[in-house]
Amino acid sequence: MYRLLSVASVPLLASLVHGYADPGACSGVCTTHDPGLIRRESDGTYFLFSTGNKISYVSASSIEGPWTSVGSMLPDGSSIDLDGNDDLWAPDVSYVDGLYYVYYAVSTFGSQDSAIGLATSETMEYGSWTDHGSTGIASSSAKIYNAIDPNLIYADGTYYINFGSFWDDIYQVPMKSTPTAAASSSYNLAYDPSGTHAEEGSYMFQYGDYYYLFYSAGICCGYDTSMPASGEEYHIKVCRSTSPTGDFVDSDGTACTDGGGTMVLESHGEVYGPGGQGVYDDPNLGPVLYYHYMNTTIGYADSDAQFGWNTIDFSSGWPVV
């Protein structure tokens, strides 16, 4: 039988999980949700994009900060004609042929009426962004997936977008050679057949011979009003494959399309509900897992979510933080 836990009990339960390093240092504006991280090619400035405020973003000279506000990426919202086009989600940022690409999601909470859009800029400075609208990756109640939480990867000469949330979970679609639009139909990469199929926020990263499919599992939000049962809050899992397009398995060999997934990071110490993750190959630190989390000493509202990051050790063949 499931029961809701009081907020006061969460730090005690989280402290029972051991073995994870604390998040790296962060100063300045450290509130974020579904972060997207990149370092500008021209001068090494870091930019961090976030769900909310029509994609809010901050910048800093170091991953540790101090982070200062830049503003909204698309202050007029998205040109995509869907509810939620003024409340954009889950930015994913990449550098493509001299332009910074930020993919974003347009949707409303719990809806499949969703689409993935794109904005580009040469500099990432405030006011420099061009909204290209929809990439053609979209969903409705007639689909078996939800077209949110985009992530771009370039592999073997092809761009792919990974996306999806609940329903049939994580999908992938090949993109055109200039990745502004989908090139063909999508296919499934990961699926949890149990419960509410609570997987989303995928991020693919190549290291060595493997492609690692990170994703967030569990309940993301609203902890201040409805605390999940212990272990059902957000946490980060991974599967891997030698191909970017399928056959992902966890460390036990269970297929990611059949509920497989190896734990990467979960609640511990003052960290609660880590997720919305990405991986950045930092020139000084090496691979870094970045994410949002609730600091139990600050609060559990969505607006309290903090920027977290840890270096990744791949020496075992699996990511360890």
From Swiss-Prot:
GO terms for molecular function: arabinan endo-1,5-alpha-L-arabinosidase activity. Pathway: Glycan metabolism; L-arabinan degradation. Glycans are attached at residue 295. It catalyses: Endohydrolysis of (1->5)-alpha-arabinofuranosidic linkages in (1->5)-arabinans. The record marks 149 as: Important for catalytic activity, responsible for pKa modulation of the active site Glu and correct orientation of both the proton donor and substrate. GO terms for cellular component: extracellular region. It is found in: Secreted. Residues 1-19 form the signal peptide. Gene3D superfamilies: Glycosyl hydrolase domain, family 43. The keyword Secreted applies. The active site is at residues 34, 200. One of its GO terms (biological process) is hemicellulose catabolic process. Keywords: Carbohydrate metabolism, Glycoprotein, Glycosidase, Hydrolase, Polysaccharide degradation, Secreted, Signal, Xylan degradation. Its EC number is 3.2.1.99. It is an enzyme of class 3 (hydrolase). Belongs to the glycosyl hydrolase 43 family. PANTHER family: ARABINAN ENDO-1,5-ALPHA-L-ARABINOSIDASE, ARABINAN ENDO-1,5-ALPHA-L-ARABINOSIDASE A-RELATED. Endo-1,5-alpha-L-arabinanase involved in degradation of pectin. Its preferred substrate is linear 1,5-alpha-L-arabinan. This is Probable arabinan endo-1,5-alpha-L-arabinosidase A. It comes from Aspergillus niger (strain ATCC MYA-4892 / CBS 513.88 / FGSC A1513).
